Amino acid sequence: MAMGVSLTSHNNPLLRHLSPSSSWVSRSSSRLSSSPLPSFLFPCRRTLLQRKLASTDGNVGYCTTTVCQGFQHSVHQRSSSVVFNGEWELRSESNKVRMVPKIIKVGNQTEVAETHQVPGTVSAWREEANKLRERNGQIARNLDDNGYFNGSVPIISSAPSYETSQKIDYEFKPRGTTRSTTATLNKELIGITQSEPVVSLPRKGLDVGDNMDVNPKGEGIQRPLISDKSSGTANGNKNTVAISKVERSTEPSNVRENLGKIYDKVLIVDNVQAAKDTVAKLVNQFRNHVHSCDTEVSGIEVKEETPVDHGELICFSIYCGPEADFGNGKSCIWVDVLGENGREVLAEFKPYFEDSFIRKVWHNYSFDSHIIRNHGIEISGFHADTMHMARLWDSARRIKGGYSLEALTSDPKVLGGTQTKEEAEFLGKISMKTIFGKRKLKKDGSEGKIVVIPPVEELQREDREAWISYSALDAISTLKLYESMTKKLQLMDWHLDGKPVLGRTMLDFYHEFWRPFGELLVKMEAEGILVDREYLAEIEKVAKAEQQVAGSRFRNWASKYCPDAKYMNIGSDTQLRQLFFGGISNSHDEVLPVEKLFKVPNIDKVIEEGKKTPTKFRNIKLHRISDSPLSTENFTASGWPSVGGDVLKELAGKVSAEYDFMDDVSDISLEEVVEDDDVETSETQKSKTDDETDTSAYGTAYVAFGGGERGKEACHAIASLCEVCSIDSLISNFILPLQGSNVSGKDGRVHCSLNINTETGRLSARRPNLQNQPALEKDRYKIRKAFVASPGNTLVVADYGQLELRILAHLTGCKSMMEAFKAGGDFHSRTAMNMYPHVREAVENGQVILEWHPEPGEDKPPVPLLKDAFGSERRKAKMLNFSIAYGKTAVGLSRDWKVSTKEAQETVDLWYNDRQEVRKWQEMRKKEAIEDGYVLTLLGRSRRFPASKSRAQRNHIQRAAINTPVQGSAADVAMCAMLEISINQQLKKLGWRLLLQIHDEVILEGPIESAEIAKDIVVDCMSKPFNGRNILSVDLSVDAKCAQNWYAAK
């Protein structure tokens, strides 16, 4: 629908502040472009002036000042609480006013210039239609029959109060003509908001939420422009136009009315006989249909608890499409399993859910599957997960829009073209808060601002009709979403290793890869992994004791300069900032006082002056402990110096927390805290570090505290503070979560949720996040030891070697990298040798060797290893190998290395000298991302990018365009390897099961006696993951070990 308008001044004095000067009216005109444009947007034909207003109901409201060519009356003014995306005009006729939509002429066609959505009820539309019929004898069909009415809008004298949007044909007569013209006004959900008169063509790929630059046109005279405020002018002659989404009306009364339409189509199954009859139809009459299913659950904190062995199924719904009739026009099934005979009713559906022939579609299959499995039913016939289909269609929605059923079905881009007129009124999942939310009562009985939702069991019993409709809508929306995603994926070509797969689409990819992968992930979640909770409890004691020691060490050091620091809260950024940066000014010229009082818990029961007994809290005075404020380049959003981990590490440098002032720091003994002698203390606590003589390892605090012993002491003390933070992270993120009952089932195994919800396709995990285990060198408490095999079993842990670098070598066709991988050995040492001539010369002269494989009895190499003799060069080579694969630039590397950008660029150029294919490939991907808006992985999954609006965003897109094919292709390889392992019949017969995938490694569990056989099979599956082949131009290196716990297998 065309979106052209023209601009004039207002006759209404209340609206004049929205217009430019009344002496200036744009007369610019241009033809509509014949070039292909997005279906939801056409170029502006005339000028538009809109001003964004505040909203009272959470929707976006607009006031528009515009008039159609041929009319001379100002636009109708809407209130700010109304979603208004169109243009109306008030026409004066015999002292009465008639509201008509604005039109334009395009050739011989007359079109409504814009679209709108106005509030009201269906009955209000029907009433106006009947009035029209009575007055003019024209046809006005009942809106319940999906109709619309013809004729002029009824004469009105004030703003209408409709609360729904319908497709309506209007008849009107443009000024100066005698012939009536009919135009159709359709409800649309996309519109333009602009803050100045413009004529512009939208860019390719314009999307909801995007901005585009526009230029004012007209008579070439610069005029004041309306800004986002009620007064003021826009700067310059360019402004931003935001493409905005107009939401459906979510007034509770209107929502419930629409839900009522669903209720009439729902068959309620709440007894055993009805269950038997329904199941008979499902497995026979409608056996060949696609069935969408959804559950409703009580007794579970979804964001905190695993659904494995948690949650109680209270009802579920099944929908096979509108053509499936279960009697009296009922097309959707809603099953009540909350009542007294609920378990018996559910048991009748067991054959249905376990029928592998019946194709079942779910939204978030993982959750529903575990909930139903909790009741002794193993689901078969998994056909699709619409959440995964949507992620495959557009991986960028994770950041903007999301993948919830509500977000997807409310988005016109997602369901566009798959809805009937009637479905458009109610399809689109509505949040529970909108339907069932009630304002929490205050103590005085009045309503507060907080909206709460009653327990779902209460809703099912007491608000039954609305609850049934809400539940059934999930299944209906899921099937419509499946139909839409099926069509969208069918329109996406499938590319394998950069080449199109003839006659195949991404829907084929989904069914061949992501559908079985999604089912495999659910099985892995159900398996879980056993954790040794006794071990976790023991290392928790050790960690807390070491944290207490490190904290006391820091406090006692700080108290030498500020006595009250002994009582400070070292977890408070405010107190630490006062201690390190007191007296400094921020970017807003606000000064942090040199000293300040803080209230802290009175742990030592100190009786303050003037008090007779100790109070719960006491005041302490903190002041800056250095002679001058410490320097830093890191600041918070408010302009104050940051005291985060990076800043503290910069102050401390690369020194140990251990120092000879330990003796007078604390009398806490680890042996007193940890009673079990078998528990190992951390490596750093076992031994003290010798006093360094080389001051280059010390941080900026060394100079700030005058150097010498005083400066060293400061750095070691701040390192102790870093240790406190590090230990706290290990306790809160790893040790404690693994012990929680919320993440484990009845068998004591941890069941995390595995998700394909990253933009590259990498797996993520939550409840708990097992993907985020600490690096081995930072795992001071050996947390991986807690992941163990059950009695009689063992673990096989298999890990890819340098997977992403091998992917990069294949994608780019880089000969140097492929030769290095073919030669084997230390890849990073070979990179350093190729980068630095002096390193190569040392290797060629035999002064160093790349790697060494000792023979029995040999304890050291004949000459130094390259990694020992040229450690600095190798470290830079290693960093570059990974950084360039991730799209990092010389600017970022200069910050990491603390060198100039020029020096970093010179090192980067050394890396590229022998790898020109990589640079060429990267430039192609950058261009592809900007011009086409997406890049592809090895198996053809796409990552979309928005149009870049700034240099920073463009740089981010270009880095992602380099990283995504590498990291996404690595995810493709890992997925294929897991599928190969899962279908291997020998592993199944031996009793081996996949438990986890953590980045590039997989963990399996099975009988001890077949461990070596299983390990060899796993290595073979991973090295040839593509149906028993390796399609890459480099070998896939796999290292595997058998052990009783994860740590021992590393």
From Swiss-Prot:
GO BP: any one term: DNA repair
Activity regulation (record text): Not inhibited by aphidicolin.
Species whose genome carries this gene: Arabidopsis thaliana (Mouse-ear cress)
Transit peptide: 1-91
Protein name: DNA polymerase I A, chloroplastic/mitochondrial
Tissue specificity field: Expressed in shoot apical meristem.
Segments for region (Polymerase): 717-1048
Every 3'-5' exonuclease domain range: 312-490
Superkingdom of source: Eukaryota
Gene: POLIA
One GO cellular component term: chloroplast
